């Protein structure tokens, strides 16, 4: 499991988490047998090291240096950025980081031949594919997963959004297919329809979710009441039309 609350959930509150909330979110992750913790696009100063692996996301349009306190770099790219992304991954790997490729809008990706012919697949800990606008059905998860398998990737991971309330079903499908890792956030915090709630995923997998329940009670209920996220008409339309949340107001489904 990868807890991406601070990074993806941060779109909701402009990454304005208090230091104590950051530290206690990490502590809940550590105490719940969650393997990866995505600290954001930059490493918060209040995080030094952890017994879980600390991840920083880098966008392909903004390749930058990464804190040595991080263990892993997850490089996010749209389909047209794949060449730059692969080059950057090799550089981050040479710097000693674990590296993940994160394919955004994965259903729109077509250049599978480029991935198939990439000779450095073994540098990746895993390749992620994302349901960026919360439009996938389980059949879409299976289709893309198998395409990536056909390209020669062994460790395949999945990032869900919950616009159509299918983040859980889609993630279960990825797990059944043998996913290396799946993403989730505290209380489903995330833009649009939100993300898969990590506390529900832990329950499904038979892991201890009690630390996250305490965390929700102490911090995330207040964040939810202040900012709001989850199922809404706009989230529904975004998922049905498979479009970015910023374009929903211009769309009639």
For every predicted segment, state its role.
Residues 1-253:
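Catalytic cores and adjacent flexible loops of soluble metabolic enzymes
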